C-alpha cells in the first residue's frame, strides 16, 4: 500500500496547504500527518510563550479537522531539530511510509534539518513545497542571476513575475475513502505558554479566514491612510496567523485582489500588498544570505560599531520606562499583548539602537521572546533596517526623534494614555514631554525622566557609526 506522510511545521491549516494537498491527491493512498515539537530548539530561537500558546491551540484544532478528513495526526516531542531527524525516520519505518511531503522552511537550522531527513530516508520519496511564500526564492533575480539587495527593484520584478502567472490557492482535502476517525487526545506542548486576545489573533482556521476577508473588504483600501497611527485599528493583525501558517500568503493575495482588484496596479490596497512583498523579500534574503540567520549584519562594516553595554538602559527600554512616552507605551503594549504596531516597532528599534547605542541583536532577541507573530526573517529584516546594518536599510544618519515621532503619529496622545496610566491626567499634546509640563505645573509624576537626552545621544551615535565606517 502507498502511504503518504505530511510533516506539518509552520503550516497549521487545511486550506491552501501545498504539501497536504499533494499528499491527498492520490485518493487510494493512506495519508498520515506528523507534528514534532522541539522545545529546546524553540527556546534557543526565543519563541514567545504567546506564540507557543497559539501553536498549541492551532494544533488541537488541526488535529480535529484532520480527523474529520480521515487523517490521523501523530504528535511527537523531542529536544531539537537534530533529534527530530530520527523521529521522522522512525515514524516512516513504523508506518511503512512511501512518500514524505513537507513545506519548506528557509531558516538555516531548518534547512540543515531537512537535508539530513532526506539523507536518512533513502527508500522514501521526499517532496518539498514553497508554501510560505507567493513566489519561491530564486524566482525573482537580477539580470546577473543574483538576489536583489534593494526592495524597490525586487518589488517591480516580483510584480512582473506575478503578472506572468499567479499561483493559485489549493482546496482543503476531501474526506478520505476510509471516512472520518476519532481525533487523538488533546495536545499539550511542553513549553511556557501565555494567554492572548483571541479576538485579535484567532485560533480557528475559519476565524482567521474571516478576519482576512473582513480586513480586505473594509481595511485594506484605507490601509495607506491609517497604518501609521497606533490609536487607530488600521492594520490587519494577520501577522500571527502568517507566522504560524494559520493562513498562507497566497490566501492573503487572492482575497486582497478579490476585494481590491486595483491593488496590483498601485490603487487601493497596493500599500498592504507592499507589506506582503516585504515579507517575501526578507524570506528570499535569508535563503541566499544564510548568515542573516546567525545574527550577522548584511553590511559588514557595521559589525565594528562599538555598542554600549548598559543593562539598566536595556531594562528600562524592555519595561517601557525610558521617559519617552511613545517608546514606553509601545513597549508596554508589546509586553501586555505580545504584539506591537508596525510604526512603533520602527520607533522603539531606532530608540534602542540610535539613542541608547545598544546592539540591535538585543532588541531582535527581546522582540522574538515577546511577539505572538515572531518571524525570524521579518524580525531580523526590521531590526537590521532600523539599525542601518541591513540591505536597503535606513541610512545610519537617519535617526528618529522619539518625541517628534510621538507628536506626528499619536498627536493627541490617545495611544500613550491608553498604555501609560500615569500620564492620563497630563493634558493635550504636552503628554509627549510630560516632564516639562510637570515642572511648570508643580506636579510630581510617577513617570521617569528621560534616561538619555536625544540630541546628545544622536551625536554619540553618529560618531560611533562614522568610526566603524572608517575602520577606526
Curated annotation (Swiss-Prot):
One of its GO terms (biological process) is response to light stimulus. Residues 2-134 form the Photolyase/cryptochrome alpha/beta domain. One of its GO terms (molecular function) is DNA binding. Binds 1 FAD per subunit. Binds 1 5,10-methenyltetrahydrofolate (MTHF) non-covalently per subunit. It holds the Pfam family FAD_binding_7. FAD binds at residues 223, 235-239, 272, 275-282, 373-375. Transmembrane segments: none annotated. It comes from the Bacteria. DNA binds at residues 227, 405. Its EC number is 4.1.99.3. NCBIfam families: PRK10674.1. Involved in repair of UV radiation-induced DNA damage. Catalyzes the light-dependent monomerization (300-600 nm) of cyclobutyl pyrimidine dimers (in cis-syn configuration), which are formed between adjacent bases on the same DNA strand upon exposure to ultraviolet radiation. Monomer. This is Deoxyribodipyrimidine photo-lyase. It comes from Escherichia coli (strain K12). The gene is phrB.
